[in-house]
Amino acid sequence: MKVSDRRKFEKANFDEFESALNNKNDLVHCPSITLFESIPTEVRSFYEDEKSGLIKVVKFRTGAMDRKRSFEKVVISVMVGKNVKKFLTFVEDEPDFQGGPIPSNKPRDGLHVVSSAYFEIQ
């Protein structure tokens, strides 16, 4: 990895950087939006390996069935060893439910606003 890129990782406070890159999956979740704003990204295809259950990057030798089941992600490519690449994908931190209402999976029909015109102000 380039020294300048490593500095960007450090600046973005991606504390789990080393442990994330030691993960066996090729696709690694990264909660730092700063990285994705400062390092060039690319779109790559991934698939879930049926034998190991790991997420792997689609390569030239990847089988046709795995290519059909693949999905695309916007990633940052990181060299972690000799001929070994990991791909970081942005995943937001889990929301803090203690600070506000619990989000719903149901779509919103619109805003329900109560106008002050309906109330008499005394």
Curated annotation (Swiss-Prot):
It comes from the Eukaryota. This is Uncharacterized protein YEL075C. It holds the Pfam family Sir1. InterPro entries: Sir1_ORC-binding, Y'_ATP-dependent_helicase. PANTHER family: PTHR31583, PTHR31583:SF2. It comes from Saccharomyces cerevisiae (strain ATCC 204508 / S288c) (Baker's yeast).
